[in-house]
Amino acid sequence: MRARFLGKDPESNEGNSPTLFATDRTDRATYIAQGWKVTDPQVLADVGDVPDHEAIIEIPEDVIKMWARRYQEGTL
């Protein structure tokens, strides 16, 4: 599997940005998100059990908006 850069949070510092990537999977469309690891106990309690092979991350709304805009424009 390969990852293709889609965009990052424009408000983040260089090298420290929440970022979104698309994969080249052929069986289904998937994305990879780089974000801040969630460690807040209340958030983790709200989410519930997370399998060891998964992680909860936080990304800014601007990254989701960027993805939605590019998806609608067909530029992904």
Sequence positions of predicted segments:
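Residues in well-ordered beta-strands of folded domains
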Residues: 4-7, 21, 34, 58
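Short, charged/polar N-terminal "headpieces" of proteins
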Residues: 1-17
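A generic structural micro-environment signature
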Residues: 12, 26-27, 65, 70
